[in-house]
Amino acid sequence: MTAGFIDLPEVFPLEQGGELNGVRVAYRTWGEPRAEATLICHALTGSADADDWWEGLFGLGKVFDPSRDYIVAANVLGGCSGTTGPTSRKPGRLAHFGPDFPAVSIRDMVRLQALLLDHIGVERLRLVIGGSMGAMQTLEWALMYPDRVDAIVPIGIGAAQSPWAVGLSEAQRHAIVNDPWFRSGRYRKGRGPDGGLATARMIAMCSYRSPDNFATRFGRVEQDGEGFAVQSYLRHQGAKLVDRFDANAYLTLLAAMDGYDLGRDRGPLEAVLRHAETPALVVGISSDVLYPATEVAELAHSLGNAEFALLDKPQGHDAFLIETDELNTIVAEWLQRERGRTPVVAAEGAGR
């Protein structure tokens, strides 16, 4: 694995107005550099360290096999993992952007990824893949750069951010901005809205899992001095995010997700999807309450050249990060059919 970054010399215009100077893109690569690559797009609080959070898909004979393919992942614009975002310093100044960071869109993220690929010599993408917010980027790749992409695998997403998902985003946003330490986004490092960000993560985690998953995993078990086990779990998840994420970046990315709509400024959604001819495997999750499988299946049936696959697991939306053995099989078998090549399903223990 190689870690790197590029600094764009040119001004980067943003879809919703405004521009950024001196944009930095942090990225990771695996395998030998070449003109064709696989691009992995990460979710809301993910990063370019895909071999960490998607470890089960990496290895000899698996979907991501560095001995076979050149693989790239980049931290998204607006995040806080190395690519320019609210925690970055303003050009030529000591001050950080903070709440002054401009609004970004999923399409901005994709355009920046395209510039990165130009810089490192990748001309064509054999596969673009991602789940959740990563799936939003994946689908935009097929619409924005159809001549550059051979195949896509979006996981756990519909054609636009639903009112249900926007509502959940708003609850998380409300928790952050109403924390007294938020201070209109002008908080100091180490003295920010930790409680609000932790609460936002707790809300999100409830949407990432499922009622059956919580019932099976936690039941009504109580822990000494900590209440129910599920309460302790959610508090732990909130605290973990506070240690590694920035509240302004979280708000920036939530807004980008809420603005996601494949039909926006392109015409009627039905026609936009029908004319999308990039081969696609659209994966839904049977227990997903954030992006229900019916919503994902509707997207698959509307695209011009897509198959639908169901990851039938109880963990909810996060199943794409948990049930990686089955996901690897689903994607690998589709790639085998699509490419007509040697199967890429891993043998027992391969690549571990």
Where are these regions (language model features)?
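Alpha/beta-hydrolase-fold enzymes
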Residues: 148, 154-240
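Catalytic-loop region of hydrolases
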Residues: 1-40, 344-352
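Catalytic active-site module of serine/aspartate enzymes centered on a nucleophile-bearing elbow/loop
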Residues: 297-298, 305-352
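Conserved alpha/beta-hydrolase "acid-adjacent" motif
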Residues: 289-295
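Conserved hydrolase catalytic core segment
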Residues: 124-167
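N-terminal cap/lid subdomain of alpha/beta-hydrolase-fold enzymes
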Residues: 28-91
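Conserved acidic catalytic loop of the alpha/beta-hydrolase fold
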Residues: 95-100, 107-127, 136
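Short beta-strand/loop motif that positions the catalytic acidic residue
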Residues: 276, 282-284
